[in-house]
């Protein structure tokens, strides 16, 4: 059913969920790989995972990546295509590929940031290898050769683009949670449409022990906010702000999120910030809104399952009704972690 979140100055209306990729029907799973990027008005690429339903109960990336193109803001999609780099890597047997984030440059170039994992451990997708980048200049018809975009092992958790510059944040740790001082969050930038990346900074959070997932968002004033997941305090999201596009940072008090947050994903739509991800203890799918990217509301549950699901991503699109946030996420269809890929639309209605 649809959900309405009421606030003094606005309401957020979230449509009913729709199945985007029916993995149950094809007896597969869809862990990770929810990247999307709009490379022309109303035209975007949407990635998803096609992975084993039995390895780690469906909660691994043992498989390959698919993608579809929509040219009408998500009303219809092309037939699925397998991402060649992911298929070749899988068949070679050295590592598997996920597309954690993708961005579209002003000239229409699609930049896909790819994670690599060995197939040697069954649990999820660790250890992480160094990330790779591939590009398409023809709307996903063909792809460049992959190259190592960051020399540190780890997981790129987020990438955003502003004024033609791509900003990417990686947690430099081949495993999930931080355990030592060298496990830090680094911010990289590309000023040539993803052909190369340079390090800008290390986000100076004083302690990254038991930290993992992270997210970034630019606010309306042009400040860049960074957030990190704290396993020890899932209702306190580490927060830092940069006033110079990621070169330097000010660490602030953690943001309080009443229902907890894992896998935080952020967006800005019609002047309202949106935060969504798994709730505390790996249960439920929760959505928060804020007017300043700091003070978040009490949170609203979008789903109440537990298990290896509710990994998500989002993209702001526009149709005849105005802007909407397309949220893509995984949801259980069987067992602990066999998941379909789902879509929901969130719209903001201003009351003023």
Language model feature labels by segment:
Residues 1-352:
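Asp-box/BNR beta-propeller blade signature and adjacent active/binding-site loops
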């Amino acid at each position: 059913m649809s959900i309405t979140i009421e606030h003094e100055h606005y309401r957020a209306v979230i449509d009913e969920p729709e199945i985007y990729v029916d993995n149950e029907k094809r007896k597969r799973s869809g862990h990770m790989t929810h990247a999307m990027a709009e490379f022309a008005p109303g035209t975007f690429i949407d990635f998803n995972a096609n992975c084993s339903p039995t390895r780690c109960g469906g909660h691994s990336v043992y498989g390959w990546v698919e993608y579809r193109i929509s040219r009408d803001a998500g009303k219809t999609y092309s037939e699925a295509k397998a991402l060649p780099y992911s298929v070749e890597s899988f068949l070679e047997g050295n590592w598997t590929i996920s597309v954690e984030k993708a961005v579209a440059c002003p000239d229409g170039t699609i930049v896909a940031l790819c994670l690599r994992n060995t197939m040697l451990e069954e649990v999820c997708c660790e250890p992480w290898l160094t990330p790779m980048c591939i590009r398409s200049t023809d709307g996903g018809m063909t792809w460049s050769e992959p190259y190592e975009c960051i020399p540190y092992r780890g997981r790129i958790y987020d990438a955003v683009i502003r004024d033609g510059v791509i900003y990417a944040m990686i947690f430099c740790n081949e495993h999930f949670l931080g355990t030592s001082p060298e496990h830090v969050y680094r911010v990289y930038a590309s000023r040539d449409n993803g052909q190369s990346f340079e390090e800008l900074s290390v986000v100076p959070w004083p302690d990254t022990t038991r930290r993992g997932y992270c997210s970034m968002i630019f606010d309306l004033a042009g400040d860049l906010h960074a957030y990190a997941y704290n396993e020890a305090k899932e209702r306190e999201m580490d927060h830092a702000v940069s006033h110079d596009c990621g070169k330097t940072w000010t660490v602030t008090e953690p943001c309080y999120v009443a229902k907890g947050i894992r896998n935080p994903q952020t967006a800005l739509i019609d002047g309202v910030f949106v935060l969504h991800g798994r709730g505390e203890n790996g249960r439920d799918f929760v959505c928060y809104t804020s007017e300043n990217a700091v003070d978040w509301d009490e949170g609203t549950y979008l789903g109440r399952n537990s298990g290896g699901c509710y990994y998500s991503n989002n993209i702001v699109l526009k149709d005849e009704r105005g802007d909407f946030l397309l949220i893509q996420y995984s949801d259980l269809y069987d067992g602990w972690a066999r998941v379909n890929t789902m879509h929901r639309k969130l719209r903001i209605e201003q009351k003023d």
